[in-house]
Design a protein with these regions (language model features):
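AMP-forming adenylation/ATP pyrophosphatase catalytic core
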Residues: 1-188
Length: 188
């Protein structure tokens, strides 16, 4: 009990081992108790969004199967009306003209970063996760839309400034996640 009380005063992420294979971890909400299980390799799925897929997305919605849901892609003309941009958690618009290289939907990797403003300033993805108080145990499960190491979108969170839609945007790439535990098919 004393160890748990001490753990509560420590920084988030600290873990202590208790008898019978039980672990206690300091999390933002308090202390989480769980049984130690063999380390499971976190799925490192990665889905490349090919040029062929993007060509099809100009004509129709392209739907890709994910282990925990679906990825929907669509490219269309943008009217310039900034009020049209959806305010949904799992639907985001990107300036298609600013996307320079291949897109990939993947989990986090070393060296990932977000552009945080139009001036090109960056923030490490890890720093973003810490600032948003996303538990370390959940970070490997979050989908990211990336071009190289630049993160365009942290699914369920912010988009990077590098491909944000602006008044000069001509075409938009609409990306939507659906069907997973955290994303809803029908967003409000």
């Amino acid at each position: 009990v004393e160890e748990l009380c001490t753990l509560y005063t420590r920084q988030v992420g600290r873990v202590i081992c208790l008898p019978y294979g039980v672990r206690a971890e300091r999390v933002y909400e308090g202390i989480r108790l769980y049984r130690e299980e063999p380390a499971a390799d976190m799925e490192r799925e990665s889905i490349e969004v090919t040029g062929e897929m993007l060509s099809r997305a100009e004509k129709e919605e392209v739907v890709l199967a994910l282990p925990d849901g679906r990825l929907h892609l669509r490219i269309r003309d943008f009217s310039g009306n900034m009020q049209e941009i959806p305010k949904k958690t799992y639907t985001k618009w990107f300036d298609y003209g600013k996307i320079k290289s291949g897109l990939r939907l993947r989990r986090r990797e070393s060296g990932d970063y977000l552009k945080i403003d139009a001036a090109g300033h960056t923030k490490k993805l890890k720093e973003y996760f810490v600032n948003e108080k996303i538990p370390a145990a959940k970070r490997d499960a979050i989908w990211l839309l990336a071009t190289g190491s630049e993160i365009l979108w942290v699914a369920g969170g912010r988009i990077g400034a590098g491909c944000k839609v602006g008044e000069n945007t001509e075409k938009i790439l609409e990306v939507r996640l659906s069907g997973g535990n955290d994303c809803e098919d029908q967003e409000n």
